[in-house]
Swiss-Prot record:
Gene Ontology cellular component terms for the protein in this record: extracellular region
GO biological process: defense response to bacterium
Protein name: Sodium channel neurotoxin MeuNaTxalpha-2
Highest rank taxon of the organism: Eukaryota
Organism this protein belongs to: Mesobuthus eupeus
Keyword set includes Disulfide bond: yes
């Protein structure tokens, strides 16, 4: 029984866990993708590995793309200023 627990734990630690998050997608300067229509955001989000996306009107960062289930490797908007437009 103990061996089964140890093997299971070892396998769990060896396999990488890919998580996803819902967030505003951002470029390398911490600026959101400005939008007007949902198809644009859906396309940009899917291009970056998300399940879907839509244009969040009048949101925290104005009209910006919000992605659902975005991979960890893709940059998202973090607190702080947008460094250039």
């Amino acid at each position: 029984m103990n061996y089964l627990v140890m093997i299971s734990l070892a396998l769990l630690l060896m396999t990488g866990v890919e998580s996803a998050r819902d967030a505003y997608i951002a470029n390398d300067r911490n600026c959101v993708y400005t939008c007007a229509l949902n198809p644009y955001c859906d396309s940009e989000c899917k291009k970056n590995g998300a399940d879907s996306g839509y244009c969040q009107w009048f949101g925290r960062f104005g009209n910006a793309c919000w992605c659902k289930n975005l991979p960890d490797k893709v940059p998202i908007r973090i607190p702080g200023e947008c460094r250039g437009r």
